[in-house]
UniProtKB/Swiss-Prot annotation:
Signal peptide: none annotated. GO terms for cellular component: NADH dehydrogenase complex; plasma membrane. It is a multi-pass membrane protein. The chain crosses the membrane at residues 6-26, 30-50, 66-86. The keyword Membrane applies. The keyword Nucleus does not apply. NDH-1 is composed of 14 different subunits. Subunits NuoA, H, J, K, L, M, N constitute the membrane sector of the complex. Coiled coil: none annotated. NDH-1 shuttles electrons from NADH, via FMN and iron-sulfur (Fe-S) centers, to quinones in the respiratory chain. The immediate electron acceptor for the enzyme in this species is believed to be ubiquinone. Couples the redox reaction to proton translocation (for every two electrons transferred, four hydrogen ions are translocated across the cytoplasmic membrane), and thus conserves the redox energy in a proton gradient. The lineage of its organism: Bacteria, Pseudomonadati, Myxococcota, Polyangia, Polyangiales. It is found in: Cell inner membrane. Belongs to the complex I subunit 4L family. This is NADH-quinone oxidoreductase subunit K. GO terms for molecular function: NADH:ubiquinone reductase (non-electrogenic) activity; quinone binding. It comes from Sorangium cellulosum (strain So ce56).
């Protein structure tokens, strides 16, 4: 069995988180913003699972990953509902136009 060092997992997780952060900061489409947040959460999940490789008898990484996935699913559902409601009202997906609190 080939053993992959923990550093590889952490580098991949850091790259995923960086891509998600850049996508969140540079893009203006609300759907792309949601996908960037999900990408960052998946990077966190990869880090938590990599923690389990270092501590194989401690299942905290897998348990936290399960909770993060459950919360991410709820966040995606609520976020998509908000984006759809915003699109119905404004007919646009740009986050710059999200000034509904300003009349």
């Amino acid at each position: 069995m080939i053993s992959v060092p923990i550093e590889y997992y952490l580098v991949v997780a850091a790259v995923l988180f960086l891509i998600g952060s850049i996508g969140f900061l540079l893009r203006r489409n609300l759907l792309v913003l949601l996908m960037s947040i999900e990408l960052m959460l998946n990077a966190v999940n990869l880090t938590l699972v990599a923690y389990n490789r270092v501590h194989p008898h401690d299942h905290a990484g897998q348990i936290f990953t399960f909770f993060v996935i459950a919360i991410a699913a709820a966040e995606a559902a609520v976020g998509l509902a908000i984006v759809l409601a915003f699109y119905r009202i404004r007919k646009t997906m740009r986050s710059d136009d999200a000034d509904l609190l300003r009349s």
